[in-house]
């Protein structure tokens, strides 16, 4: 997912600040909810992520008085096409903004974000991805600790695509040093796709994970030689048709970008060499054509 501009998290609107302060004093978030929904740019293709990040950061900074509001927003079951779906998005940023050096607290917050990452609403998942990437430097162990913490997510259809989206964000890749953790996350996602039972092959979560794989691996292979080497190795061993197509797409994307010529060539060669041979029509029995 493209990085969004989230550098400005200070609330600039006096009306929003007053509404937020009122909600914190009273514990009644109805006016705040309505204000955020009106300003969300939803329904529409470009939700106001800068506002979601700013409101989330303000709620996180308020600490315990805001905890009930964040829980309320996170649990709101608003339809994807309504402005009130913005509130779980704000909750994602509030949770992410609360991540700090306390390992136990960070793990608990990450689990709450994981639950939001399983949401069927696409805009909520998008907000979770972006909020995670924003919080990555503040996770215990920094960006490398963050990537390692997301590896288990990659073994899940429900969370895997969100994890890959966050890991593939330029803000994460540019600061990542532990290439083995990147490989572990990508390999876990690939194994999840390959090992899925046939009955799960049309699962929406699996489809999202499969769609996320080429984007993330292309970005990660550009940044990490170990990921590029993983691509060449996996291309030689993968037998699953969907995964092979994803690997072919990664090779094409790297070729278009002019990146990793040695590894992408090795991957392309391995994919060609490991293709199933065409069926010999002379061996087909009558009635099987």
What does each model-identified segment do?
Residues 1-89, 93-98, 246-289:
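N-terminal alpha-helical scaffold/docking segments in eukaryotic complex subunits
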Residues 11, 26, 38-46, 75-86, ...:
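Short coil turns that connect the paired helices of HEAT/ARM alpha-solenoid repeats
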Residues 21, 37, 52-56, 113-114, ...:
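Amphipathic alpha-helical repeat scaffolds
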Residues 29-37, 60-77, 100-115, 137-151, ...:
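Amphipathic alpha-helical scaffolding segments comprising HEAT/armadillo-like alpha-solenoid repeats
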Residues 53, 90-93, 130-131, 165-168, ...:
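Residue-level signature of alpha-solenoid helical repeat scaffolds
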Residues 86, 90-139:
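Hydrophobic alpha-helical segments and helix pairs
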Residues 172, 176, 184-265, 273:
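Extended alpha-helical scaffolding segments
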